[in-house]
Amino acid sequence: MSEKSVEAAAELSAKDLKEKKEKVEEKAGRKERKKEVVEEEENGAEEEEEETAEDGEEEDDGDEEDEEEEEEEDEGPALVRAAEEEDEADPKRQKTENGASA
């Protein structure tokens, strides 16, 4: 009889161990899912904050610099054209400035 009780105890403990193992695995799975959800929420919030800050700052600074460069580029050829037009409009003045008679 003692052998049967030992075998029964071993069987129960094996079943108990199996059930406990399943419960532990279920709990671990739940914890992992919760962690993933929390991490996704945290990462999503952090990314949105970073994107908002970076986009706002970079766009403002970048636009101002681009506008200044465009204005300088636009002024350059216009000034050259204006000087050429003055030379063509006043040929007499050009000659007198060069030392030739008018």
From Swiss-Prot:
PTM annotation (N6-acetyllysine): residues: 4, 15, 92
UniProt keyword Phosphoprotein present: yes
Phosphoserine modification, residue list: 2, 5, 13
Annotated disulfide bonds: none
Modified residues (N-acetylserine): 2
Keyword annotations of the record: Acetylation, Immunity, Phosphoprotein
Pfam families referenced in this protein's UniProt entry, alphabetically: Prothymosin
Compositional bias annotation for Basic and acidic residues: 13-37
List of residues that carry Phosphothreonine: 52
Molecular-function GO term, any one: histone binding
Residue numbers spanned by region Disordered: 1-102
Acidic residues biased stretches: 38-76
GO biological process: immune system process; negative regulation of apoptotic process; positive regulation of transcription by RNA polymerase II
Family: Belongs to the pro/parathymosin family.
Reported function: Parathymosin may mediate immune function by blocking the effect of prothymosin alpha which confers resistance to certain opportunistic infections.
Protein name from the UniProt record: Parathymosin
Organism this protein belongs to: Bos taurus
